[in-house]
């Protein structure tokens, strides 16, 4: 029992350090806010040469669950989790906001924060996934959520992608480890278009690395679709386009905050796909 408990604890801790994701918040012509994400998980956690798959990704794909979090007789929020993980990296509160987390690759990263938290006792630092759960449990608005996430001191650098219910309510919050400051990228100041934001795992004001450019194909697909055609179906197609879809992709989630609707699909990139 002790061994199982330790495994569950490690699962919840290290889950935050091996994700490679794509998140999109888009506004359709009706003024509704749609939020979509690919969860890519398991980077460097065992490559199977025979099947050309990531071992951890294949295991976790079988454990994807949609959860309805309740307080008393009231549904507070919905999330998509891997069974056993108790934080929130993908979820929405009907009529309030939606939320996804992408890992931010940085030299001053999460393992340093983990050392500070465990060894040095710096308990001011917050776990990324548990902070996501706190946001939903507080039933915050889009603006309140943005403020809380922007000022939080984190164990690991991260991107928080938040959607709301009103025109223009889509933002990418870029956070460094241990800082109360943040960079906010909104639909309004998106240089690609003013009706969506798109985030992978690299700062959107820098060029993506040549070995992992999911951002450029994502923007190309969004422009080909156009705002007038934005829907669950077209966002799913964007996230199913290689290399946005890759060997690490476990699932795609689509959320409409205005309608209180969420759909999740298991994903698998078969054949000659990018490993990440």
Q: Where on the chain are the PLM-derived regions?
A:
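C-terminus-biased signal that marks the final domain/tail of proteins
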Residues: 1-20, 130, 134-276
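A contiguous strand-loop segment
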Residues: 1-127, 155-157, 250
């Amino acid at each position: 029992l002790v061994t199982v408990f330790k495994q569950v604890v490690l699962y919840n801790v290290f889950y935050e350090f091996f994700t490679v994701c794509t998140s999109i918040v888009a506004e359709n012509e009706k003024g509704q806010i749609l939020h979509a994400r690919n969860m890519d998980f398991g980077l460097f956690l065992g490559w199977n040469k025979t099947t050309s798959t990531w071992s951890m990704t294949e295991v976790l794909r079988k454990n994807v669950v949609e959860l309805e979090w309740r307080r008393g007789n009231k549904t507070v929020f919905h999330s998509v989790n891997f069974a056993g993980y108790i934080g929130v990296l993908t979820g929405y509160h009907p009529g309030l906001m939606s939320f996804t987390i992408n890992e931010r690759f940085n030299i001053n990263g999460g393992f340093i924060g983990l050392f500070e938290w465990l060894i040095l006792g710096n308990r001011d630092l917050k776990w990324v996934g548990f902070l996501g759960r706190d946001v939903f449990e507080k039933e915050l608005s889009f603006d309140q959520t943005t403020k809380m996430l922007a000022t939080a001191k984190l164990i690991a650098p991260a991107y928080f992608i938040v959607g709301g219910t009103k025109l223009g309510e889509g933002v990418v919050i870029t956070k460094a480890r241990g800082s109360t400051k943040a960079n906010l990228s909104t639909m309004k100041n998106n240089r690609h278009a003013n009706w969506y934001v798109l985030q992978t795992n690299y700062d959107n004001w820098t060029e993506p690395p040549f070995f992992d450019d999911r951002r450029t194909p994502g923007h190309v697909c969004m422009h080909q679709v156009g705002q007038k055609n934005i829907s669950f179906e077209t966002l799913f197609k964007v996230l199913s386009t290689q290399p946005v879809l890759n060997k690490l992709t476990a699932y795609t989630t689509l959320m409409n905050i205005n309608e209180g609707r969420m759909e999740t699909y298991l994903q698998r990139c078969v054949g000659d796909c990018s490993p990440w």
